[in-house]
């Protein structure tokens, strides 16, 4: 079943990106430059993104921030996000996200997640874990580069942890992302900022993070040597605030990456991040790969 899910996802993405390539044509400004996450779509446009994140760690920090070695743990997340515009004024978009995860623990190598095994007694779990209907809108008409994306994450798993192997949070999450971008007059530099908030609610016994609030600001600085290519640096911070469940943590990550416009409609990205500090958290690194198609 797990292979059918991934093959179906891969086949869907290939069909989308093939269709996008067929629509390829020259453009003055690439979608990579024009459509930052803060931009909204007009009616009939589609934004389809397939993003893959591999997090692996061999070190962690306790509540005081003291670091120590750990047995390697690996967490792979593959997400498919689909959005479309519903009016000509580009003020509201609607979308749906789905996540697939594959995790391994107890010293298994980082690439073990790509075996997509679901055997908790052998330190591995995998499966489709959540879906999230979303809405994205511009709250201030005069500031089109400031948008808010609100999503409601619905868990699809019965157990958060089995035989010590964590798969995903078993709780409902209300997520709000605040996006803003600024482009320099030279159009070679772009600054993108976001604040991501996640409120987890439900019974404390159902999820470790229920009844808590996560706040994650981030800043991305991109340099465009040309319209079809950009390199970027980023800084992100995450703070989980315990409301009634008694669990809190935080971390800071820095990273760099690149994006390239393959065709008029399709671009891909590679990003690396390193967790440089934290409290009661892992101190690992992430390797990220994404494909994005913008269709008229």
Protein language model features and the residues they cover:
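Active-site-adjacent structural elements in folded domains
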Residues: 203-205
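Bacterial Sec-dependent N-terminal signal peptides
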Residues: 1-22
């Amino acid at each position: 079943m797990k292979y059918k899910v991934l093959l179906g996802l891969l086949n869907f993405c290939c069909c989308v990106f093939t269709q996008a390539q067929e629509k390829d044509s020259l453009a003055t400004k690439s979608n990579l430059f024009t459509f930052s996450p803060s931009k909204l779509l007009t009616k009939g446009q589609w934004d389809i993104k397939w993003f893959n994140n591999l997090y692996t760690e061999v070190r962690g920090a306790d509540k005081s921030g003291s670091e120590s070695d750990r047995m390697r743990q690996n967490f792979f997340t593959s997400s498919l996000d689909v959005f479309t515009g519903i009016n000509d004024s580009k003020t509201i978009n609607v979308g749906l996200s789905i996540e697939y995860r594959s995790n391994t623990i107890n010293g298994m190598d980082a690439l073990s997640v790509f075996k997509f095994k679901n055997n908790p007694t052998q330190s591995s779990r995998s499966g489709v874990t959540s879906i999230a209907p979303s809405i994205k809108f511009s709250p201030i008409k005069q500031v089109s580069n400031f948008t808010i994306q609100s999503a409601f994450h619905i868990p699809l798993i019965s157990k958060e942890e089995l035989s010590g192997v964590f798969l995903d949070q078993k709780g409902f999450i209300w997520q709000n992302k605040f996006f803003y971008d600024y482009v320099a007059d030279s159009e070679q530099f772009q600054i993108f900022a976001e604040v991501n908030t996640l409120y987890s609610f439900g019974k404390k016994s159902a999820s470790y993070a229920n009844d808590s609030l996560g706040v994650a600001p981030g800043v991305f600085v991109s340099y465009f040597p040309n319209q079809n290519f950009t390199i970027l640096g980023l800084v992100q911070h995450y703070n989980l605030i315990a409301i009634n469940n008694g669990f809190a943590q935080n971390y800071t990550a820095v990273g760099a990456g690149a994006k390239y416009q393959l065709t008029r409609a399709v671009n891909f990205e590679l990003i690396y991040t390193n967790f440089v500090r934290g409290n009661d958290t892992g101190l690992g690194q992430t390797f990220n790969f994404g494909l994005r198609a913008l269709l008229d």
